From Swiss-Prot:
Lineage: superkingdom: Bacteria
Region (Involved in Mg(2+) ion dislocation from EF-Tu): 82-85
Protein name as catalogued: Elongation factor Ts
SUPFAM superfamilies assigned: Elongation factor Ts (EF-Ts), dimerisation domain, UBA-like
Primary location recorded for the protein, binned into one broad class: cytoplasm
Organism: Flavobacterium psychrophilum (strain ATCC 49511 / DSM 21280 / CIP 103535 / JIP02/86)
Keyword Protein biosynthesis on entry: yes
Gene: tsf
Classification via HAMAP family: EF_Ts (MF_00050)
Length: 274
């Protein structure tokens, strides 16, 4: 039987992230064969993952990253079961590493099939489920491109956002972060009026009609009044029309124009735990 040293255990722990006792047990069972020990730990992860597949994974880390020239950004959520795990330094580090890798892919399916230190992202999640003892999954994957893309991560990694702009300009870094912070705080449903789907608009009109009828407004006037109330709905719920959180005297669109008269927000992405 092979002699298992502390250095061997530490090496396996570095490779897999598993606990000391789990690593020692795996090495003993594999008679010092590292590849077999790693495989056994992954099989353990598969068993744990199968047993926890129906668990809720609403905690974790929401991470937004951009590439070196700020033209592409990705926001992901790496979800787990408890806040205790979600705030763990190694868990957050893994989420950031995965987010940076995600910049190279266009969708979640491609990303999950990609290589992460010798195994796929999907298999890494299963492996770490066995290590941590909680269900892990990539819940959100959103990509955004633009002439300039900025990011913001809210305290505690609970919300992460990206914003895209039509051009680069002096002060764009701060503006991009401020608008991304706006998207995190105010949770708009769309960039502008054109981005709000027809079903949502129809629903809001019906809500307004019901309120007007309750107020006793004449039926002949209700349709036009209800449509008129959409302006307030768009102002509250679309990013560029919202009051800017740092100066409510102007809209987000006007704040952006104060940076550069020709600058506009072209898109945003928002991911939140829960």
């Amino acid at each position: 039987m092979a002699t298992i040293t502390a250095a061997d255990v530490n090496k396996l722990r570095t490779i897999t992230g598993a606990g000391m006792m789990d690593c020692k047990k795996a090495l003993v069972e594999s008679d010092g064969d590292f590849d077999l020990a790693i495989e056994n730990l992954r099989k353990k992860g598969q068993k744990v993952a199968a047993n926890r597949s129906d668990r809720e994974s609403t905690e974790g880390a929401a991470i937004a990253v951009v590439n070196a020239d700020n033209t592409v950004g990705v926001v992901i959520t790496l979800n787990c079961e408890t806040d205790f795990v979600g705030m763990n330094e190694n868990f957050v580090k893994m989420a950031v590493e995965m987010a940076n890798l995600a910049l190279n892919f266009n969708n979640k399916e491609e990303f999950l099939a990609s290589d992460f230190n010798g195994i796929t992202i999907a298999d890494k999640l299963i492996e770490q489920t066995g290590v941590i003892g909680e269900k892990l999954e990539i819940r959100t994957f959103e990509k955004l491109e633009g002439a300039f893309v900025g990011s913001y991560i809210h305290s505690g990694n609970k919300i992460a956002t990206l914003t895209a702009f039509s051009a680069k300009a002096d002060g764009i870094e701060e503006a991009a972060r401020n608008v991304a912070m706006q998207a995190a705080a105010m949770n708009p449903i769309a960039l502008n009026e054109e981005g709000v789907d027809a079903d949502t608009i129809a629903k809001e009109i019906e809500i307004a009609k019901d309120m007007l009828r309750a107020e006793g407004k004449p039926e002949a006037m209700i349709e036009n009044i209800a449509k008129g109330k959409l302006g307030r709905f768009f102002k509250d719920n679309t990013l560029v029309n919202q009051d800017y959180i740092k100066d409510s005297s102007m809209s987000v669109a006007n704040y952006v124009k104060s940076i550069d008269a020709n600058l506009i927000v072209t898109g945003f992405k928002r991911a939140a735990l829960g």
